[in-house]
Amino acid sequence: MEKPCTLLVHFDKGSPSMANEIKADLEGSDVAAKVDAMKRAIMLLLNGETLPHLFITVVRYVLPSEDHTIQKLLLLYLEIVDKRDVASGKVLPEMILICQNLRNNLQHPNEYIRGVTLRFLCRLNEPELLEPLIPSILANLDHRHHFIRRHALSAISAIYRLPHGDQLLPDAPEVVERALTGEQDASARRNGFLMLCACAQERAVAYLLTNAERVAEWPDLLQMAAVDLIRKVCRSPNRADKGRYIKIIISLLSAPNSAVVYESAGALVSLSSAPTAVRAAANTYCQLLSSQSDNNVKLIVLDRLHELRASHRDVMVDVVMDVLRALSSPNVDVRRKVLDLVLDLLTPRNVEEVVMYLKKEVVKTQAGDLEKGGEYRQMLVQAIHSCAVEYPEVAGSVVHLLMDFLGDTNVAAAVDVVLFVREIIETNPKLRVSMIQRLIDTFYQIRASRVCSCALWILGEYSLSLSEVESAISTIKQCLGDLPFYTVSEEGESTDASKPAQPVVNSVTVSSRRPVVLADGTYATQSAATETAISSPAVAPGSLSSTQNLRSLILSGDFFLAAVVACTLTKLVLRLEEVQPSKAEANKASTGALLIMVSILQLGQSSYLPHPIDNDSYDRIVLCVRLLCNTGDDVRKVWLQSCRQSFTKMLAEKQFRETEEMKAKAQISHAQPDDLIDFYHLKSRRGMSQLELEDAVQDDLKAATGEFTKDADDANRLNRILQLTGFSDPVYAEAYVTVHHYDIVLDVTVINRTKETLQNLCLELATMGDLKLVDRPQNYTLAPESSKQIRANIKVSSTETGVIFGNIVYETSNVMERSVVVLNDIHIDIMDYISPATCADVAFRNMWAEFEWENKVAVNTVIQDEKEFLDHIIKSTNMKCLTPPSALDGECGFIAANLYAKSVFGEDALVNISVEKQADGKLSGYIRIRSKTQGIALSLGDKITLKQKGGSS
């Protein structure tokens, strides 16, 4: 396994008797037995057996065979057998015996034997064996069969790339170039062209430019090789022919092969930043997006479009509608990426067209699969919400359509709709009247408690005119139904007093005022729907039921919603007193509201529900009752103005945060004032094409804005060097750790500090945790006071803290035993795998409820300020705080915040911090971590436990 090999087959260890059986079968005349014996011999050799005496047997009894299977196995055997003497490093003398056989095979009348022999020569590294075969190999370039010519070109390429291959085939590039001129086979042309690309790039470039007009007609294999060559050539400083290369790439954008088209688009973007070139690449990606059915291909293409958006947003804006057409894919991940990309490309010019397209998609979701349609509809609602917030003028065209989905069976989608309505009604005063009327009309359809709560708040805050207030109160009363909420049957009172008292069955009469929709779509004018239940329906708040409305939600025990109803009615009555000229009507409405509140309190304190009313909801409703009985001006101002002002302030802060984040992203480095400037009009006199001209100007712009300059990271690299041994150890070692997404690379520098040569020096590593070593350790010889760079690759499969430990083992001439130097442990930090991320509050709560792994860490710190402690945890965990700064301001003795991050493996890490200051000034509380996997929850908990004790260290 230490040697490079192209073949790997597992086989159990053999025995001497098996070696004798193989030898006997090879010496026999049975072809099938010979085939089986050759297979066993190959598997034994691959798994470490030497079989030293078998080679002569193979030469005597297998070499002369004409059977194709035996000849193929013979070549595999010759490929893996040791051809050099271990001690001297020279080719074994008996190996010369196979040269004549190989020469005969290269001249064999059977094309298959010639072809497989040429393919075998591609993996032969001994010049002594190859040199006698060179004339035969070259002769096969003129063979009539393309199979042989193809492998002859591959063999010439492999031989020429050997350490002394240019001595074996000094004129190989000229020979291959001549062969290419008359070659018609696609694979043969590709093999020859790749040989020129690797060994004689200038000849490959000359061949490409000579055939530039015909590249579009080349076979796809050769086109891919041409694209790779252009990438390599244009990386070099000499870019005189760049315009010709770009023309070739543009001609390949219309190639029939999708892989060629994709690679050409990527090459075009890397070659040129001119708007014309970028636009051509973007259009090509959009065509691939619509023509390819594989979702993985769509996701890859969308990633490329995201990269283009980051550097060429102005050009990408023109293809936004083409990108939107990818929403026809049923895959949720594709749709999500499309919407994310489109939202980044919104402009005042295209926002209306985008929103109209999204509206059509929303309507389509009603006819599709209910489950998938709900999730897709939620994404569309969020996208439209973002459009309307950024460009308020489009809100009016979509808000009424979306309000039809307030009663959506997908609660998350309905919540997104009502939050959208709440924000738009505040930011677009012109839409307030129509939105309030629409909300009143659709309020009966709402089935989710959270949606009801938000809708009631909207009605209480934004119903301003007399008709709006009266309609809102009437709607709430109708949804609550008849009062009281229950009646006690008195049948038990008529029983004979002499009989034992029987348990009284209490019935709850529930009346529903939900409007009935008839077959023709109109509302029924009469309803006699009354249902009697022995006990209240056990329906959890926020769950879905076909008969669920405001009344049934409250009867299910949702007293938080009942408290919201009480607050909304209080606001509406207070506003009615301001807009209603008739005092009697206002008092009548106030009395009706009080009756509803008292009925709710009575229901909450009764024994008919499984759970009584909670104290918070009870206090809230009682406060509303007292307020309506005795209202002061200050209290009226708080209820009618302060709540809305708080919401307005929250929206303003949200907008400010988003603006600041956009400004931070837009920060780019600038060039120095004395940098050279080229003028566009002066350049136009050079006779350049329009595309070359645009490209040159774009390069100048990039240089002027500092886009070409990368910050030097050398100082940061030094911080990641870990000392593995002490300075007094005979072998000093230090490692530089590079963390990639799925692997860790250790670049270990080993220094021999002694005056002796260290032999068989080996870096032995082991891992703990979800880490796995990829390479087997190798032995090295280290001269006195010299150094060696050793690289070790470690595979990572999950976000979990791991430990790498090991030692360095070596031998010296003076000491018989092997010496060992133990290395310091290398701890792989979870912080290398997680990065700050954002998500909506609704998504955070859904994940919090869904994730099963929780790690609860008690607060134990010397920090005495809550905000300082929160900042310390955020810095230590590399997470983003989702709680807005306004919610964290002020001194109140406690703090609660949510943190969020994503790992490179796509895992979500959720943290909730709840801290309270004690009387002695110390902080107490808990930090709860939730994730889908155990590893990230435990590792993050260990990190927090380790970091929270210190101050800002």
From Swiss-Prot:
GO terms for cellular component: COPI vesicle coat; Golgi membrane. The coatomer is a cytosolic protein complex that binds to dilysine motifs and reversibly associates with Golgi non-clathrin-coated vesicles, which further mediate biosynthetic protein transport from the ER, via the Golgi up to the trans Golgi network. Coatomer complex is required for budding from Golgi membranes, and is essential for the retrograde Golgi-to-ER transport of dilysine-tagged proteins. One of its GO terms (biological process) is intracellular protein transport. HEAT repeats lie at residues 49-87, 93-127, 128-165, 314-351, 393-430. Transmembrane segments: none annotated. Pfam families: Adaptin_N, Coatamer_beta_C, Coatomer_b_Cpla. GO terms for molecular function: structural molecule activity. It is a peripheral membrane protein. It is found in: Cytoplasm; Golgi apparatus membrane; Cytoplasmic vesicle, COPI-coated vesicle membrane. InterPro entries: ARM-like, ARM-type_fold, Clathrin/coatomer_adapt-like_N, Coatomer_bsu_C, COPB1, COPB1_appendage_platform_dom. Oligomeric complex that consists of at least the alpha, beta, beta', gamma, delta, epsilon and zeta subunits. This is Coatomer subunit beta-1. Gene3D superfamilies: Leucine-rich Repeat Variant. Keywords: Cytoplasm, Cytoplasmic vesicle, ER-Golgi transport, Golgi apparatus, Membrane, Protein transport, Repeat, Transport.
